Amino acid sequence: MRAVLGDSGVDVTSSTKGAFGGDRGTSLDVRCQVTAEGRGRVGVTISGAPRPRAEYGTGELYTAVPARDTLPVPVGHGWSGLLATDNARQGDPGDGKATASVLLDCAGNGRSLLITVETTLGAATLDDPATRPSFVRTATATAQRADDRWDCGARLGKQVYDVDLPVNKDEYEPLIGADGTCATVPTAARSAVSTARETARARAPREVCALGARDGSSRYRLDAYYGPYAEDARAQYTRNDGEDVTPAEKPAGRLGQSAYWAGADCPDGAPRALYLVRADDADGDARARPDLGYERAALSAFAARSAEDHGCAEPVTP
């Protein structure tokens, strides 16, 4: 954190609750906040996973990653992690604020540690390629210490020297030729799908492919969730779904009239990966002329490629 906030004039608060381990989930919850007046704030959370089922229904299980207006990008360099922001444009209100997360899959026991760092720097801009790695290195350095402290034995990455900028809404490209998170996803004439916003693939615990029309206007969104993020997404559907059958109950299916999901078993006792496709013009309501065949085809292609990259089994699709 010194590289981000400096050495002097900082205020630190911290707390540690719960324990890492147990047959019914791990309750470990570590929080630390460092504030430097006039320079910014860094908040760190270390969460053990999976959580006890008693926590389901009490809110989000893990610190949320911004992914509504921008697409989070992978940390890379051998880490399973993300860099995310609400807005990545220089001078915009969200500039200088970022969330970095790193997932440690502990050796041989199906448990993991999720490290999340939320940073606000008043004078910094994410548009500066020198700034982004310093955000991320706070998370990777914390992950290294957490791995040793809780005897996780995870595969660690290398020093992070560069990180991509999260992808904004207007940064779309032709879907044909996509080579990242949208690779292999087909176009669709009926649904007017011909463009994509995507990120690189690098073992990130969350992946997004946003599909659009020729002018970039949104049509569909494909999401992949791994580890704690898959657990949290299923827990959200368990308590908030309002549907007959949900991802919490079956490996694949249809969410009412608005979406489909798929699932894949992953190695070393990790939670089943979750893949979702949702039309951007749907919020649970029936649509006049849904292109259901395309939605299933897009989900199948997206899930298969993502699962392969993560070493998971062939997905079960609707």
Question: Where do the model's predicted regions map?
Answer:
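Extracytoplasmic low-complexity, Pro/Thr/Ser/Ala/Gly-rich segments
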Residues: 1-62, 152-212, 222, 290-293, ...
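A short, solvent-exposed beta-edge/loop patch
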Residues: 79-152, 243-318
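Context-gated lysine
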Residues: 17, 97, 111, 158, ...
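Intrinsic-disorder/low-complexity coil detector
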Residues: 49-51, 65, 71-73, 165, ...
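General structural signal for secondary-structure boundaries
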Residues: 1-6, 76, 102, 131
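Intrinsically disordered, low-complexity segments enriched in Gly and acidic/Ser/Thr residues
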Residues: 192-283
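Ordered, small/hydrophobic-rich secondary-structure cores
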Residues: 29-123
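Surface-exposed beta-strand edges and their flanking turn/coil or helix-capping segments
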Residues: 59, 128-133, 235-237
